[in-house]
Structure formats: C-alpha cells, structure tokens
Amino acid sequence: MADQARAQIGVTGLAVMGRNVARNLARNGFTVAVHNRSPERTRSLVAEHGDEGTFVPGETMADFVASLERPRAVIVMVKAGAPTDAVIDELVPLLDEGDIIVDCGNAHFADTRRREESLRAQGLHFSGTGVSGGEEGALRGPSIMPGGSAESYAKLGPMFEKIAAQVDGVPCCMHVGPDGAGHFVKMVHNGIEYADMQLIAEAYDLLRAGLDATPAEIAEIFREWNNGELESFLIEITADVLAHTDAATGRSFVDIVQDRAEQKGTGRWTVQSALDLGIPITGIAEATFARSLSGHVDQREAARRTFPDAGEKWQVSDRDKFVEDVRRALLASKIVAYAQGFDHIRAGSQEYNWDIDLGGTATIWRGGCIIRARFLNRIREAYDEQPDLPTLLVAPYFAEAVSAGVPSWRRVVADATRAGVPTPAFSSSLAYFDALRAERLPAALIQGLRDNFGAHTYQRVDREGSFHTTWAADRTESPA
C-alpha cells in the first residue's frame, strides 16, 4: 500500500532490478520510498504490488527525499556511468550531512572510489554495493556486497541482511570494506562467472564432439554432475537450457541460438584490473576473449573456409571414462578460476587498503548469486583456517581434487587439441597450473633478451643485486 509514513529507505530507478529490490524490502517489513524519472513507473509499482508492503511514492526527487527518515538512505538503481552521476548530482542538494547514497548498479570500482571521496568531503556517505542474483535474486534474496564506511553499514546492514539470501541461517551479505571494495568484489565475482560459464560451454562442446550426443542427452550428464562436487546454480541451469526445445522449430534450443556471446563489460574490467595489479587471471581472461572472438563472425567464416579439416577425426572408445575425464577436468579448471579470482581480490585489498575477508566473501557467495556453488563452503573453510593461504590450490581439499583430476585434465586437453575443438579456458587453466608448480620457468631467457636489447638488467640466482651484460661489446657483466 502507499503510505505517508516516513520511509526507512528509498529506491530511485524502478527498472526491473530497482523495482524488485524495492519489493523485496517492502515484503520484509520495511517502509520504502520509491521514485522514478518517469512517474508512471512509480505509480505502476504501487498499483501492482502495493499489497506486498508499505511504499511511499515520490512524484519528484524532492518529494522522494522528503519522505525519508534521517539519516536518509537512498538506493540508486540506474545505468552505470553518466546516468549514475546525474542522479547523484540531483540528490546531493536535497540531502543533509550524514545521509547515505547507495549505488547498487554495476559501477566500476574506480568510479565508486571517486564518488565516495567527493561525497565524503561534502559530509555524505556513499556505499558502492554489489548485488548479484539477477531479477529473481533481487526479489527473493540476492548476494549483497556493500562497500563504504562502517557508519553507513550500521544503517544499511540490518536491512540488507534481512533481504539477502540466507544459507544455513547466515545472510549472504557482509560489509566488504571501504570506498570501492564492494564493487571491486562484485566485479571479480562477475569475472569468475565469465570463466565458469566458458568452462561449462567448453565441457558441453567436448561432450557433443566426443560422444556425438544430442543437447538433451548432455543435459542428463549435467544433471548427474549437479548431484556431486560440481553442484552449482550454473550447472543446474545448464541442464535446463540444454534440455529445452524451441517451440517454433522443434529443434534443440541451443541449436537455434546464434553462437555469439555478448558481454556488458565487467569481465573486461576484471581483466584490466588484474593486469594493473599484476595478477595472472588467465582463465577469466580467456573466457572474456572467447566472447570477443565469438562476435568476429566474418573472420570466423573466412577461417572455417580456409582450414576446413585442421583437426583429426575424434572417436571416443569408452563413453563413461570420457564423461568422467571431462567432469574432472571441469572441476580442476573451475578450482583454478576461483583461485585466480580470490588472488585478485586479495591483491586489490592490499593495494587499496580494504582488508577484505576472503572467507567471508566465499560465505556471502554461497546463496543468491550467480556463481553460488557447493564448494564455496570449502573455500570459506580454507581461508578461515589459513587467512594467508598463498593460493587456494594448495588448501588440502582443493589440492586433492586437482591432483586427482590432473590425468583426466591432460587427456581432455590433448584430445581436444588433436580434434581441433577449442578449449581456451580448459587449456589456459592447465597451463597456469603447470606454470605455478614448475621448479623453474623460461622467464630467465626473457630477462636475458630484455637485457640484450634494452639494458633492462637481471638478477642472478647466486648473489644479490641487479646486473647488466654489455652484449654488443665484450659481454662483460657489471652491477647495475
């Protein structure tokens, strides 16, 4: 119902996500002020869902802000970038010291840091808050990753923890850290999501090529996998999508969808950030590039015509063994993707002084979000037991799972390579694993080459300091 009472929190921007967050808050007993640039959406929300709780509609931004109790908390749910800045600029003159602006959109964490600094100087709190779970999650319980000050979380926390997904009685929400921490963690979440989906797609492609199976038959394999270590939301819906039949043609749904995967940019942001921090997130990077490559249709067609028979004929002799090999390779590659993602979060936390709880991050990803999976409990346990874990791969559970999967992993990548089936995420994850465990890498040669053409110096294994060799002259070595 509509009410003239003071609202505990407000939502401006009532497209699907904003509308569902407002409804979720109202359903959980909070009085919610609602506003949209076009008042028709505000009226529509109250008319259609007013019986779910108490809404206070605001025709104008001034009316909307005036209806909020102090300190005011305003959730902004508009497109990232300039539209978000425009709404903030409209809000600021209407707010008072101590009020809170919450950006629940997919903002770049650097923009969030800029906005937080600017608004803090004006006496306002700014919480960049990641929300994962899509439309259904926003309504029924998402994973929520709030950043910003501890003071802002004191106001927001009780509300966000109430509307978030719950797993084992624990809300999938925690105060991630100051300024851009919440949006940074959400960005990395999305990067892991890219890798997870690419790995699943490659597993499907391998099963289809190796078994000559139909999508419906492969759906049953994924359903079986979802009963074990791979249990996750994405594996569950993969089975649903593969089993779906197109009503218009009677064909498998995946066979009538164009094979061009789109992206909104968070995968690219994740890769760019990792490059800035010097963190090798190879699986996430390959997943992002795979989407880019899928869109280069003209190049793909030209290559297909030029190299029609570049792969060997593939014939699987033992179906069950092959399916198990793909399952183990998928699990090992997935572990690598999560390990890289958590390495990235730790590096960002150190660089920006955020002090992010890695075990806590795994905890709030267990429900509501797109990458929710059974083994997030294991990730939480690993970081709770050893917060300074050098890499998730060496935690006992994950080390055992990866070790058990290595022979299958190698067979799958080798078979795919011979058959000409592209597995960029599987292959790069295996290469990352091998590079990480290698006693010595060929990077020594690279350093020698850099010193040869650019006098970039090198360090020796037998003494301290940097050195340079005069390659063009007498090749003597001297301290740099």
Regions found by a protein language model. Name each.
Residues 1-66, 70-72, 98, 134-138:
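NAD(P)+-binding Rossmann beta1-loop-alpha1 motif at the extreme N-terminus of oxidoreductases
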Residues 403, 408-480:
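C-terminal amphipathic alpha-helical interaction region
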